[in-house]
Regions:
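C-terminal catalytic "cap/lid" subdomain
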Residues: 1-152, 156-179
Length: 179
């Protein structure tokens, strides 16, 4: 107990810090098997190209989830590869929308992959707790699970992986963070 030397009032009791729910960053692990990956290859790296693509997808009522853009200056022509995920039922429609934009936007090709899953760890304060993403990636690497895309927010870290590894990844993350 820490007390004032100027009076006899009760002081403050100082004790060892106890663990609380705030210490538990990850509250859940999920696997979404209903995702598909779309990549637009060789999109000229110019203002407005990505906006045109995502506006067209939005007008077709296609929800886009994770987005990754890789810029390249190979051959002296700045281009980008744009990869994103959509719900599997929207994949065919997304492909048609993109093909309708190919001549206008000048990209090389579109590829799709339905054999992916999205594994997420969910909790409060992901950004304010260092090492959560590193631990997630280490757990997945130890299981031989390759990460294709990564997305982070204040409450969630998600990765796109091969669908065949989904259950194994989810179990390993559950064991690492929740048991």
């Amino acid at each position: 107990e820490v007390r004032s030397s100027l009076n006899d009032n009760p002081g403050t009791i100082v004790k060892e810090e106890t663990s609380s729910m705030e210490d538990v960053v990850v509250r859940g692990v999920s696997l979404d098997k209903n995702q598909a990956k779309v990549t637009v290859w060789g999109l000229p790296d110019q203002p407005g190209r990505a906006a045109r693509i995502f506006n067209a997808l939005s007008e077709a009522t296609i929800n886009v989830d994770m987005i990754v853009q890789n810029a390249s200056h190979a051959g002296g022509n700045p281009a980008t590869d744009l990869t994103f995920t959509v719900d599997k039922p929207d994949l065919t429609k997304a492909g048609k929308v993109l093909e309708s934009l190919r001549a206008e936007l000048g990209f090389r090709e579109v590829s799709t992959d339905e054999s992916i899953g999205k594994v997420s760890i969910v909790g409060v304060g992901m950004r304010s707790h260092s090492g959560v993403a590193a631990r997630m990636f280490t757990v997945l690497a130890a299981e031989g699970v390759n990460i294709g895309l990564i997305s982070t927010s204040e409450i969630k870290i998600s990765v796109v992986i091969d669908l065949a590894s989904g259950e194994k990844a989810m179990r390993a993350l559950h064991q690492a963070f929740l048991e």
